[in-house]
Protein backbone atom coordinates (compact mmCIF):
# COMPACT_ATOMS: atom_id res chain seq x y z
CA UNK A 1 0.00 0.00 0.00
CA UNK A 2 1.15 3.53 -0.76
CA UNK A 3 -0.37 6.45 1.12
CA UNK A 4 0.34 9.26 -1.33
CA UNK A 5 -0.75 12.61 0.03
CA UNK A 6 -2.00 14.69 -2.89
CA UNK A 7 -2.62 17.79 -0.76
CA UNK A 8 -0.94 18.48 2.57
CA UNK A 9 -3.43 21.12 3.65
CA UNK A 10 -6.89 20.88 5.17
CA UNK A 11 -10.04 23.01 5.16
CA UNK A 12 -11.02 21.91 8.68
CA UNK A 13 -9.54 22.74 12.09
CA UNK A 14 -10.44 19.68 14.16
CA UNK A 15 -9.52 20.07 17.80
CA UNK A 16 -7.85 16.65 18.08
CA UNK A 17 -5.76 16.99 14.90
CA UNK A 18 -2.15 18.24 14.74
CA UNK A 19 -3.06 20.13 11.54
CA UNK A 20 -4.71 22.64 13.89
CA UNK A 21 -2.59 25.14 15.81
CA UNK A 22 -3.63 24.75 19.48
CA UNK A 23 -2.97 28.46 20.16
CA UNK A 24 -4.49 30.18 17.12
CA UNK A 25 -6.99 27.48 16.18
CA UNK A 26 -5.95 27.85 12.55
CA UNK A 27 -5.03 25.07 10.15
CA UNK A 28 -1.53 24.50 8.80
CA UNK A 29 0.26 23.85 12.10
CA UNK A 30 2.43 21.17 10.47
CA UNK A 31 4.33 23.93 8.64
CA UNK A 32 4.10 25.66 5.27
CA UNK A 33 6.56 23.28 3.62
CA UNK A 34 4.06 20.46 4.18
CA UNK A 35 0.97 22.22 2.82
CA UNK A 36 1.63 21.63 -0.85
CA UNK A 37 -0.37 20.06 -3.64
CA UNK A 38 1.43 17.13 -5.25
CA UNK A 39 1.88 17.70 -9.00
CA UNK A 40 -0.05 15.22 -11.11
CA UNK A 41 3.03 14.12 -13.07
CA UNK A 42 5.00 13.41 -9.91
CA UNK A 43 2.05 11.48 -8.52
CA UNK A 44 1.98 9.29 -11.61
CA UNK A 45 5.74 8.72 -11.44
CA UNK A 46 5.41 7.54 -7.83
CA UNK A 47 2.44 5.29 -8.60
CA UNK A 48 4.31 3.78 -11.55
CA UNK A 49 7.40 3.08 -9.44
CA UNK A 50 5.37 1.60 -6.60
CA UNK A 51 3.50 -0.59 -9.09
CA UNK A 52 6.78 -2.28 -9.99
CA UNK A 53 7.13 -3.17 -6.29
CA UNK A 54 3.69 -4.79 -6.12
CA UNK A 55 1.31 -1.91 -5.39
CA UNK A 56 -2.27 -2.92 -4.52
CA UNK A 57 -3.82 0.15 -2.89
CA UNK A 58 -3.25 3.91 -2.98
CA UNK A 59 -4.65 6.14 -0.26
CA UNK A 60 -4.82 9.69 -1.59
CA UNK A 61 -5.18 11.63 1.66
CA UNK A 62 -2.13 11.08 3.87
CA UNK A 63 -2.66 13.77 6.49
CA UNK A 64 -4.37 16.29 4.22
CA UNK A 65 -7.77 16.71 2.61
CA UNK A 66 -7.82 15.13 -0.89
CA UNK A 67 -10.97 16.96 -1.99
CA UNK A 68 -9.03 20.25 -1.96
CA UNK A 69 -7.68 19.11 -5.31
CA UNK A 70 -10.38 20.04 -7.80
CA UNK A 71 -8.94 17.49 -10.22
CA UNK A 72 -9.15 14.66 -7.68
CA UNK A 73 -10.76 12.46 -10.33
CA UNK A 74 -7.58 12.70 -12.43
CA UNK A 75 -5.49 11.33 -9.55
CA UNK A 76 -7.96 8.49 -9.09
CA UNK A 77 -7.84 7.72 -12.81
CA UNK A 78 -4.07 7.36 -12.62
CA UNK A 79 -4.36 4.87 -9.77
CA UNK A 80 -6.84 2.84 -11.79
CA UNK A 81 -4.60 3.05 -14.88
CA UNK A 82 -1.94 1.14 -12.93
CA UNK A 83 -4.36 -1.48 -11.67
CA UNK A 84 -4.51 -0.46 -8.01
CA UNK A 85 -7.42 0.41 -5.74
CA UNK A 86 -8.07 4.09 -4.98
CA UNK A 87 -8.99 4.99 -1.39
CA UNK A 88 -9.81 8.42 0.03
CA UNK A 89 -10.30 9.47 3.66
CA UNK A 90 -12.00 12.87 3.83
CA UNK A 91 -14.17 15.24 5.85
CA UNK A 92 -16.55 15.07 2.89
CA UNK A 93 -17.64 18.71 2.97
CA UNK A 94 -16.79 19.28 -0.71
CA UNK A 95 -17.91 15.84 -1.92
CA UNK A 96 -21.14 16.79 -3.66
CA UNK A 97 -22.84 17.40 -7.01
CA UNK A 98 -20.70 17.11 -10.17
CA UNK A 99 -17.47 16.86 -8.17
CA UNK A 100 -18.78 13.81 -6.33
CA UNK A 101 -20.02 12.19 -9.51
CA UNK A 102 -16.66 12.74 -11.21
CA UNK A 103 -14.88 11.01 -8.33
CA UNK A 104 -17.20 8.00 -8.43
CA UNK A 105 -17.10 7.79 -12.23
CA UNK A 106 -13.28 7.93 -12.16
CA UNK A 107 -13.36 4.62 -10.30
CA UNK A 108 -12.78 5.41 -6.63
CA UNK A 109 -12.95 2.14 -4.68
CA UNK A 110 -13.39 3.40 -1.12
CA UNK A 111 -14.43 6.84 0.12
CA UNK A 112 -14.59 7.44 3.86
CA UNK A 113 -16.25 10.42 5.58
CA UNK A 114 -14.73 11.46 8.91
CA UNK A 115 -17.60 12.51 11.17
CA UNK A 116 -16.49 13.19 14.73
CA UNK A 117 -19.53 13.88 16.88
CA UNK A 118 -23.07 12.56 16.51
CA UNK A 119 -24.90 15.89 16.91
CA UNK A 120 -24.41 19.31 15.35
CA UNK A 121 -23.08 20.62 18.67
CA UNK A 122 -20.53 17.85 19.15
CA UNK A 123 -19.44 18.02 15.52
CA UNK A 124 -18.90 21.76 15.92
CA UNK A 125 -16.92 21.19 19.11
CA UNK A 126 -14.59 18.53 17.72
CA UNK A 127 -14.39 19.40 14.01
CA UNK A 128 -14.93 23.14 14.44
CA UNK A 129 -17.34 23.17 11.51
CA UNK A 130 -21.03 23.98 11.07
CA UNK A 131 -21.36 21.45 8.24
CA UNK A 132 -22.58 18.41 10.18
CA UNK A 133 -25.78 18.03 8.18
CA UNK A 134 -23.98 18.77 4.92
CA UNK A 135 -21.48 15.98 5.60
CA UNK A 136 -24.33 13.57 6.34
CA UNK A 137 -26.28 14.51 3.22
CA UNK A 138 -23.15 14.33 1.05
CA UNK A 139 -22.36 10.86 2.37
CA UNK A 140 -25.88 9.62 1.77
CA UNK A 141 -26.04 11.16 -1.71
CA UNK A 142 -22.70 9.65 -2.67
CA UNK A 143 -23.82 6.22 -1.52
CA UNK A 144 -27.03 6.58 -3.53
CA UNK A 145 -25.11 7.62 -6.64
CA UNK A 146 -22.78 4.63 -6.27
CA UNK A 147 -25.81 2.33 -6.33
CA UNK A 148 -27.46 4.19 -9.21
CA UNK A 149 -24.34 4.28 -11.37
CA UNK A 150 -23.40 0.66 -10.84
CA UNK A 151 -20.08 1.57 -9.23
CA UNK A 152 -18.35 -0.99 -7.03
CA UNK A 153 -17.22 1.72 -4.60
CA UNK A 154 -17.69 1.39 -0.86
CA UNK A 155 -18.83 4.52 0.97
CA UNK A 156 -17.98 4.52 4.65
CA UNK A 157 -17.92 6.68 7.75
CA UNK A 158 -15.30 7.03 10.46
CA UNK A 159 -16.06 8.09 14.02
CA UNK A 160 -14.20 8.57 17.29
CA UNK A 161 -15.42 7.86 20.80
CA UNK A 162 -15.62 11.18 22.65
CA UNK A 163 -16.18 9.83 26.17
CA UNK A 164 -14.68 6.48 27.15
CA UNK A 165 -17.10 6.24 30.06
CA UNK A 166 -20.04 6.42 27.68
CA UNK A 167 -18.97 4.14 24.82
CA UNK A 168 -22.13 2.07 24.49
CA UNK A 169 -24.35 5.15 24.18
CA UNK A 170 -22.05 6.87 21.70
CA UNK A 171 -21.82 3.79 19.51
CA UNK A 172 -25.61 3.63 19.34
CA UNK A 173 -25.79 7.31 18.35
CA UNK A 174 -23.21 6.86 15.61
CA UNK A 175 -25.00 3.74 14.37
CA UNK A 176 -28.12 5.84 13.74
CA UNK A 177 -26.10 7.97 11.31
CA UNK A 178 -24.64 4.90 9.65
CA UNK A 179 -27.94 3.08 9.27
CA UNK A 180 -29.69 6.14 7.84
CA UNK A 181 -27.01 6.53 5.16
CA UNK A 182 -26.63 2.79 4.55
CA UNK A 183 -22.83 2.95 4.66
CA UNK A 184 -19.98 0.93 6.12
CA UNK A 185 -18.40 2.28 9.28
CA UNK A 186 -15.76 1.98 11.95
CA UNK A 187 -15.71 3.59 15.38
CA UNK A 188 -12.39 4.00 17.19
CA UNK A 189 -11.03 5.30 20.45
CA UNK A 190 -8.95 8.44 20.05
CA UNK A 191 -5.18 8.19 19.63
CA UNK A 192 -2.42 10.60 20.52
CA UNK A 193 -0.69 11.34 17.21
CA UNK A 194 2.78 10.23 18.35
CA UNK A 195 2.36 12.19 21.58
CA UNK A 196 1.37 15.50 19.94
CA UNK A 197 -2.24 15.21 21.16
CA UNK A 198 -3.19 14.06 24.64
CA UNK A 199 -6.62 12.39 24.84
CA UNK A 200 -8.41 12.19 28.17
CA UNK A 201 -7.66 8.48 28.53
CA UNK A 202 -4.49 6.42 28.17
CA UNK A 203 -4.27 3.12 26.36
CA UNK A 204 -3.03 0.18 28.37
CA UNK A 205 -1.05 -2.83 27.20
CA UNK A 206 2.37 -4.15 26.33
CA UNK A 207 4.63 -1.80 24.40
CA UNK A 208 6.13 -3.23 21.23
CA UNK A 209 6.74 -2.16 17.66
CA UNK A 210 3.65 -1.15 15.70
CA UNK A 211 5.07 -3.14 12.79
CA UNK A 212 4.87 -0.33 10.27
CA UNK A 213 8.62 0.05 9.56
CA UNK A 214 8.75 -3.62 8.51
CA UNK A 215 5.47 -3.77 6.59
CA UNK A 216 4.81 -3.17 2.86
CA UNK A 217 3.25 0.19 3.68
CA UNK A 218 4.69 3.46 2.40
CA UNK A 219 3.69 7.02 3.37
CA UNK A 220 4.59 9.78 0.91
CA UNK A 221 3.87 13.45 1.54
CA UNK A 222 2.99 16.24 -0.85
CA UNK A 223 5.62 18.45 0.78
CA UNK A 224 9.00 17.92 2.37
CA UNK A 225 12.09 19.53 3.83
CA UNK A 226 13.82 22.53 2.23
CA UNK A 227 11.04 23.11 -0.28
CA UNK A 228 11.15 19.56 -1.61
CA UNK A 229 8.21 17.34 -2.49
CA UNK A 230 7.54 13.65 -1.98
CA UNK A 231 8.94 13.24 1.53
CA UNK A 232 8.62 9.74 2.99
CA UNK A 233 7.42 9.25 6.57
CA UNK A 234 7.18 6.09 8.70
CA UNK A 235 3.40 6.50 8.98
CA UNK A 236 0.66 9.13 9.08
CA UNK A 237 0.77 9.29 12.89
CA UNK A 238 3.85 11.53 12.81
CA UNK A 239 1.63 14.42 11.68
CA UNK A 240 2.75 17.41 13.73
CA UNK A 241 6.31 16.06 13.90
CA UNK A 242 6.77 16.13 10.14
CA UNK A 243 10.24 17.68 10.06
CA UNK A 244 11.67 15.12 12.49
CA UNK A 245 10.46 11.99 10.75
CA UNK A 246 11.66 12.31 7.14
CA UNK A 247 13.25 9.15 5.74
CA UNK A 248 13.96 10.45 2.24
CA UNK A 249 12.35 12.27 -0.68
CA UNK A 250 11.02 10.89 -3.94
CA UNK A 251 12.25 14.12 -5.50
CA UNK A 252 15.82 12.93 -4.84
CA UNK A 253 15.69 9.16 -4.49
CA UNK A 254 14.14 6.02 -5.92
CA UNK A 255 11.81 3.80 -3.92
CA UNK A 256 14.56 1.22 -3.49
CA UNK A 257 17.06 3.83 -2.31
CA UNK A 258 14.63 5.14 0.29
CA UNK A 259 13.43 1.85 1.81
CA UNK A 260 16.95 0.39 1.92
CA UNK A 261 18.62 3.64 2.92
CA UNK A 262 20.35 4.48 6.19
CA UNK A 263 17.43 6.37 7.76
CA UNK A 264 14.84 3.66 7.10
CA UNK A 265 17.31 0.96 8.20
CA UNK A 266 18.00 2.88 11.40
CA UNK A 267 14.27 3.17 12.12
CA UNK A 268 13.78 -0.57 11.69
CA UNK A 269 16.67 -1.29 14.05
CA UNK A 270 15.21 1.11 16.63
CA UNK A 271 11.91 -0.76 16.44
CA UNK A 272 13.71 -4.11 16.80
CA UNK A 273 15.54 -3.02 19.95
CA UNK A 274 12.79 -0.89 21.50
CA UNK A 275 15.05 2.17 21.45
CA UNK A 276 12.40 4.18 19.62
CA UNK A 277 13.14 7.59 18.10
CA UNK A 278 11.51 10.63 19.68
CA UNK A 279 8.83 10.80 17.00
CA UNK A 280 7.77 7.21 17.81
CA UNK A 281 8.39 6.60 21.50
CA UNK A 282 5.32 8.47 22.80
CA UNK A 283 2.93 7.07 20.18
CA UNK A 284 0.08 4.97 21.57
CA UNK A 285 0.16 2.79 18.44
CA UNK A 286 3.07 1.03 20.19
CA UNK A 287 0.67 -0.12 22.89
CA UNK A 288 -0.89 -3.52 22.23
CA UNK A 289 -4.48 -2.55 23.00
CA UNK A 290 -7.04 -4.64 21.08
CA UNK A 291 -9.94 -2.49 22.33
CA UNK A 292 -9.14 0.54 20.17
CA UNK A 293 -11.47 -0.51 17.35
CA UNK A 294 -14.77 -0.27 19.17
CA UNK A 295 -17.24 -1.15 16.41
CA UNK A 296 -17.35 -1.94 12.71
CA UNK A 297 -20.05 -3.29 10.42
CA UNK A 298 -17.74 -4.40 7.62
CA UNK A 299 -14.60 -6.47 7.19
CA UNK A 300 -12.13 -4.25 9.01
CA UNK A 301 -9.59 -5.91 11.24
CA UNK A 302 -7.67 -3.86 13.81
CA UNK A 303 -4.27 -4.54 12.27
CA UNK A 304 -5.23 -5.20 8.64
CA UNK A 305 -4.69 -2.20 6.43
CA UNK A 306 -7.65 -1.27 4.22
CA UNK A 307 -7.72 -3.06 0.90
CA UNK A 308 -4.49 -4.98 1.50
CA UNK A 309 -3.58 -8.58 2.16
CA UNK A 310 -1.07 -7.90 4.94
CA UNK A 311 -1.65 -7.75 8.68
CA UNK A 312 0.47 -5.54 10.93
CA UNK A 313 0.38 -8.27 13.57
CA UNK A 314 2.69 -10.25 11.30
CA UNK A 315 5.29 -7.50 11.68
CA UNK A 316 4.97 -6.92 15.41
Annotate the PLM regions:
Residues 1-110, 121, 125-126, 133, ...:
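Conserved alpha-helical substructure of the radical SAM core
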Residues 5, 53-61, 81-89, 104-119, ...:
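Conserved C-terminal portion of the radical SAM core fold
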Residues 10, 14-17, 210, 235-236, ...:
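Short cysteine clusters
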Residues 69, 95-97, 120, 167-168, ...:
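Short, well-ordered alpha-helical microsegments
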Residues 140, 144-155, 176-203, 231-232, ...:
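C-terminal accessory region of radical SAM enzymes
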Residues 215-239:
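Active-site and channel-lining beta-strand-loop segments
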Amino acid sequence: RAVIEINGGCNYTCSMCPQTDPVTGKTGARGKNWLKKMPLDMFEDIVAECTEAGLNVVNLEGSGEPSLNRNLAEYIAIVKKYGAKAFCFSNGMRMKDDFMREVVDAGVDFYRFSIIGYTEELYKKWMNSPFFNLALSNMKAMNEYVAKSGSDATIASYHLVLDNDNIEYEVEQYKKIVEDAGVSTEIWKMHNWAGVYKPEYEREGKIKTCGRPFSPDLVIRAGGLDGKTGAVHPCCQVLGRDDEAVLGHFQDNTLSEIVSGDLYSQLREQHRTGNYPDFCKSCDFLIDDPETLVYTNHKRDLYKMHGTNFDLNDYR
